[in-house]
Regions:
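Glycine-rich, phosphate-binding/catalytic loops in enzymes
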Residues: 48-49, 73-77, 101-104, 183-185, ...
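Active-site neighborhood of divalent metal-dependent phosphoester bond hydrolases
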Residues: 70-156, 195
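A general structural motif
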Residues: 26, 52-54, 80, 162, ...
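Acidic, His/Gly-enriched loop-helix segments that form or flank divalent-metal centers
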Residues: 123-239, 243-250
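N-terminal active-site segment of His-dependent metallophosphoesterases
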Residues: 2-74
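Residue-level marker for buried hydrophobic side chains located in beta-strands
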Residues: 31, 59, 85-86, 165, ...
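Binuclear metal-dependent phosphoesterase catalytic core
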Residues: 233-276
Length: 276
């Protein structure tokens, strides 16, 4: 598996061509912020978008951890041909630290990941592979986890379109060629990107998650727009992580690349959530 901090970010030109073609033909491309295991909320948000067959959805990473149904979120993203994803830092940690043979036990390998939400992800796999009689199928879980991890490990780190860059965390304004920036930067950067005094890409708005609205001093019902503008007066960057796992107004945000519309879904508190 990758997750190697020294590598530069991976792109998928086929995905980029499909998304750009969607926009060129008048279709909607909805970009959704960090889901963090809230499968019911993701499903409700996507249903509210009333997608046509031409429309597409991009998840900005951090599909997993903290919420109760990470296993189901990955299943939704894998199986729906209208959904694409970029890799987030929580998937990177899952790739490095998910120990299927010791699932449910906080081993030394899994300790760091468990601390920041991985425990809920591990439990979601246990829940999905525990029958109504309480029988736990470790064999089936290992097969499913192997497929999920292989799928995650092949995801692009960023998506580049004519007018937008879609990435989990952002870019460094100091590290030169954006296509050669490290995976560590693309999945973890914060302040230096948020505080950039010039656009990191003078032709494209960067749409990102990772950093929550309260971190910008905003309400969760808002989105963050950089005060720095492109030559066409569009914001240089837009942040859409509404912090669906906590705060006073936990919600999930979708941003439409074609129209600029924003749709939000309040987090659905399921019975499962009470168990985690």
């Amino acid at each position: 598996m990758s997750g190697c901090d020294t590598m530069h970010g991976r792109r998928n030109r086929k995905i980029e061509e499909e998304l750009q073609s969607t926009l060129d033909n008048g279709g909607n491309v909805w970009v959704i912020g960090d889901v963090h295991g809230h499968a019911d909320t993701l499903t409700a948000l996507i249903e509210s978008l009333n997608l046509d067959s031409i429309d597409r959805v991009v998840l900005l990473g951090d599909l997993v951890d903290r919420g109760p149904k990470s296993c189901e979120v990955i299943r939704i993203a894998r199986e729906d041909s209208q959904i694409f994803c970029v890799l987030g830092n929580h998937e990177e940690m899952m790739l490095k630290q998910f120990d299927v043979d010791n699932i449910g036990t906080m081993t030394a390998q899994q300790a760091g990941w468990y601390y920041i939400g991985g425990r809920a992800t591990a439990q979601s796999y246990i829940d999905d592979f525990t029958g109504t009689s309480g029988d736990f199928s470790r064999f089936d879980l290992k097969q499913r986890a192997a497929k999920d991890l292989a799928w995650l490990d092949a995801l692009p780190h960023h998506i580049v379109l004519d007018d937008f860059r879609l990435v989990h965390a952002g870019y460094s304004p100091w590290d030169g060629d954006l296509d050669l920036q490290s995976t560590d930067t693309l999945m973890w950067v914060r302040g230096e990107f948020h505080n950039a005094i010039t656009p990191v890409d003078e032709n494209r708005t960067v749409i990102f998650g990772h950093s929550t609205m309260p971190g910008f001093g905003l309400k969760q019902s808002e989105i963050w727009e950089s005060e720095v503008e492109l030559l066409n007066s569009r914001p240089a960057a837009i942040g859409i992580d509404s912090c669906c796992y906590g705060g006073d107004e936990p919600q999930l945000t979708a941003f439409n690349l074609l129209t600029g519309d924003v749709v939000k879904q309040q987090v659905i508190i399921s019975k499962d959530l009470a168990k985690h």
